[in-house]
Amino acid sequence: MQEHPSISKATVDRLPRYYRCLRQLSDEGVSIASSEELGRRLSINPEQIRKDLTAFGQFGKKGVGYYVAELKESIGGILGLDQHLSLAIVGMGHLGAALANYQGIERLGFRLAAIFDSNPVVIGTRVGERRVEDIAYLAEIVAERSIQIGVIAVPAAHAQHVADQLVAAGISGIWNFAPVKLHVPPSVPFVSEDLSV
């Protein structure tokens, strides 16, 4: 994400919500949306939306609204979504396979660079354009393909070991889908998804 040191964390935290709403409006064929429409959809005061967006530049026209495609592209740029991060999925169970087959992954700002598993039955099979690699070669492939994000989709009992392998391989961040709390160095950004709720 671009640096804007004078902008509040609360404003920055709302940007992904604005982006998702604009993407939905775009998918619905809406070309112009007012701050009132955005506010209604997001349950955010329209004045707050105008204030948040003004912090990043001039968007929209008074009395007209915001051009959805233009604002979506601008917020995507601020969030860094115009730069696809390469990711590797570790674990080809049901969840890993679903993530690997998800067609919208590039819309989220990611590029699937590798898939890993330890099961000999799965290694060598294909998921879309990608071949499932042996996790024994994780460090080598992460370096070769400049992989930035490691996605953990393994059972809880194996998740910490996989996290350790990803960190040792030099991964920049971890996205954990295993239902367990993991310990990673503070220098490695870490997001954990709890799918049980």
Q: What are the roles of these predicted feature ranges?
A:
Residues 95:
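Hydrophobic/small residue at the entry helix of a nucleotide-binding pocket
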Residues 106-130:
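NAD(P)-binding Rossmann-fold cofactor-contacting core
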Residues 92:
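Glycine-rich Rossmann-fold phosphate-binding loop(s) that bind the pyrophosphate
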Residues 32, 36, 41-86:
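HTH-adjacent hinge/linker in prokaryotic transcriptional regulators
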